[in-house]
Amino acid sequence: MATTHVAGTELEFKAAKPPLIKPFLVSIGIVYLLAMHFFMPNPGGSGLALAFNPTTWLALSFSIAIGLYQFGTQGKLRYNKLTVGLFISCVMLTLPVLYHNAAPSLSSGKLIGLWSGYLLFVVLQQFRFSNKQKQRLLWFITIAVFIEALFSWAQFFLLEPGNIFGYNTVNNRPYGIFQQPNVMASFLATGLALSGYLLTRQPTKYQRKVSEVALLYLMPVTTIPLLIFLASRTGWLAGVLSVGLLLPYIYRFATKKRFFGWSLAVIAGVTIGLSTNMISADASLASQRANLESPRQYTFPQALDMLIEKPFTGYGYGRFEPEYIVYTARQHQLNEAYKPGLAAMDHPHNELLYWGVEGGLIPLLAIFLAAILVLVRIAQTTRGTRLALFALFVPIVLHSQLEYPFYHSAIHWITFIILLYWVDQRAASYRQLSLSFVSQTLLRVFSLVIPILVSFFMLTTLHTNYVLTQFERSQPKTPELLEQVSNPIVWQDRFDWDIFSTYLNIGLHQQEAKFIQPYIDWSLEIIKDKPRPAFYNNLILAYQGLGETVKAEQIRREAQFLFPERDFSQVSYIPPNIDVLKAQNEQEQQ
């Protein structure tokens, strides 16, 4: 009998490398349990201007890197009809950036976010998770909501004026880490919906402690009062719709004990919220918010008018703010009953209108295609579970039609993608496509490059935020601090504003044209993309400081045309007494 030795030869059996499921889940856990809760003092804003977004993207880059490495190692692409359909949608959403009226530099952020979300979706599809591991993704979201709820309770009851978080204890609308009540409200409502959904899906194990699902009973008690305190109509509507859609599912598939337990928790949450609100000094806020008056009553029709005027090509990606202000100003000039546009509105507070106004028909078709594909996936799931799955999307989708959560909070976008994956895996079977050696190698290379580049960019973004905040809080201003800026890309407008407005103040104070002219040169460029009252106000002063009264009046008329509800007639530069300044300087030098 012959013995064949195969060790060290091509015949040797090669054990399959274990999938990187656990490291991937740990990285997603870090995103939800640590990275998204990071705070750093900032002047407000959206996107990467808020410190929790850079840390969230930084952590997510490692999740994507692990997924790409797994992708390259297994050498096969798992995909289905939804993968292809969403890819087509993303391509269609990207096409208008090639139009002649687009501003690629101003729209690059949303497109990078769009494709990053799609990449995360594809990465999730590559892992063969167990049912428990799939549910763990939903648990991460739920626990993250609970953490934010605890932080919000601390804001509401514990924080004092002048706190390190910059939380306004007078208005006292506990917005958590998000710095915006409606963003917090949709996040809370998502966690509320997930608590009922997960409670139904947990196996009933007798003679076991209830601690495994105790958090799911606590969620309504902790989140619903906060939704009331926040006085967010978006949150109220999302909460009511989600609970209403979930209750039939819980009643049908959960035990009666769990159904009544969760229902009582919802009732307890409403009772706590209403009773606390009634005895609070701010009890009138919720009643005020119940009034449906809102700027959306005229901004939505205005954006719709713009879409109707240019339905095919739109006004150009990245061009919403200047085109909106000019359009509404012209309409107001023709008809005084037409409401002037809102200053500094760079988004119509409706995702469909935003993509439609900027890009025209193709982006709208892309969004409808994606929506139909997801609804078909939901329809393919087990009867009786469809409304519950739809309920998970209600808070974020509803919010996206009333504001812009995806641009304010990265975690909302990531959560939305994970929910898409959850629906997809409930109803889909996958096909496989073998990858070439070159493709596998490239995927492994990208798995190393992406986290390095993203980490560098996000860390320098945080550092720049710190430097600019220190500069803006310094009294008197110390321009030397601005030399420490390491990455002005995200903060370019704010960075330039700090520099040139400081020059302008010095120039007006000392009557030095060499300091005034740089502000004029910069502001004439920025108002093309961001026509805002503050820029026009200072531009009038700058021209007056140079003695160019004709140009100052031209700018004043332009500003009054664009913002007819503001009074620019009182903007006037009063020169300082130069003799007094010289005398003061001489005394300081002696």
Indicate where each model-derived feature is located:
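Transmembrane signal-anchor hairpin modules in multi-pass inner-membrane enzymes, especially those
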Residues: 1-95, 101-109, 116-123, 127-135, ...
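Interfacial juxtamembrane loops and adjacent helix segments
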Residues: 160-172, 286, 290-293, 305-309, ...
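Transmembrane alpha-helices of multi-pass inner-membrane enzymes
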Residues: 243, 385-440
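Helix-to-loop transition at the C-terminal end of transmembrane segments
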Residues: 41-47, 153-164, 276-288, 312
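Membrane-interface micro-motifs in multi-pass membrane enzymes
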Residues: 47-59, 106-111, 175-190, 234-235, ...
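A membrane-periplasm/extracellular boundary helix in multi-pass inner-membrane enzymes
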Residues: 230, 250-292, 299, 304-309, ...
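Alpha-helical transmembrane segments of multi-pass inner-membrane proteins
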Residues: 2-4, 13, 20-37, 56-68, ...
